[in-house]
């Protein structure tokens, strides 16, 4: 397994609701947050990488949509996820 696969499985294991859960909103948001965090570090050294910045904005938008869905579906799970990921200040 590559480092990315190992990190991905750790995130899935941490946020999964069940044994084989990979598609719940919590897992999807956690994976997107991990990728967003990595890309944010990338932009500190490569400020003019506009192509990747567009991908970052798509990921942020997708995460926002998933969070809005979860907030409407189950507010308690939404608040727990936000606190666990440390997204809202």
Swiss-Prot record:
GO molecular function: rRNA binding; structural constituent of ribosome
GO BP term, pick one: translation
Signal peptide start and end residues: none
InterPro entries for this protein: Ribosomal_uS15, Ribosomal_uS15_bac-type, uS15_NS1_RNA-bd_sf
Gene3D superfamilies: 6.10.250.3130, S15/NS1, RNA-binding
UniProt keywords, alphabetically: Ribonucleoprotein, Ribosomal protein, RNA-binding, rRNA-binding
SUPFAM superfamilies linked to this entry: S15/NS1 RNA-binding domain
GO cellular component terms given for this protein: cytosolic small ribosomal subunit
Assembly mode: Part of the 30S ribosomal subunit. Forms a bridge to the 50S subunit in the 70S ribosome, contacting the 23S rRNA.
NCBIfam families registered for this protein in UniProt: S15_bact
Family: Belongs to the universal ribosomal protein uS15 family.
Function, in words: One of the primary rRNA binding proteins, it binds directly to 16S rRNA where it helps nucleate assembly of the platform of the 30S subunit by binding and bridging several RNA helices of the 16S rRNA.
Protein name: Small ribosomal subunit protein uS15
């Amino acid at each position: 397994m590559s480092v990315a696969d190992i990190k991905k499985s750790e995130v899935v294991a941490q946020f999964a609701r069940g044994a084989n859960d990979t598609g719940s909103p919590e897992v999807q948001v956690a994976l997107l947050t991990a990728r967003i965090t990595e890309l944010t570090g990338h932009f500190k050294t490569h400020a003019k990488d506009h192509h990747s910045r567009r991908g970052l904005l798509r990921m942020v938008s997708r995460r926002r949509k998933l969070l809005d869905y979860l907030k409407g579906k189950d507010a308690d799970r939404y608040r727990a996820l936000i606190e666990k990921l440390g997204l809202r200040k």
